[in-house]
């Protein structure tokens, strides 16, 4: 079973037909695994246009397409999607899609099992990505931007729980 990466994505594009096709793919999947990333970065001839673990990790940034779509909405030129991926965010697929389809995007992601949180944005020509560890000696609010923490409000409370557990374990060792 993979570690699940939570993702909150916003794509903006003048090509509303393309955005509608992405939303339609999410609706047609009807709870199954949509071919969302496959629309952004399609399989290629070298893998016979079929799923391949190494290819997906290299070209999508994750081994499977998105799943557990919790929210999807299209409003004019803006598509918003909240979903899950395996182990890591689909940054490579989003960048490929951005370069091929001319959209901009913002992606916030959090992977609790691997203890990281991040933000990626693409402006249509290039992208910027920043990732932070969530379990350090310092509270996440002291080094992670508010907009990133706002996307995943449980990160701060999880850190406080972890700090409390660490203190309890240390006390047990001292008492032994």
Which stretches of residues belong to each language-model region?
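Long, contiguous binding/interaction regions
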Residues: 1-176
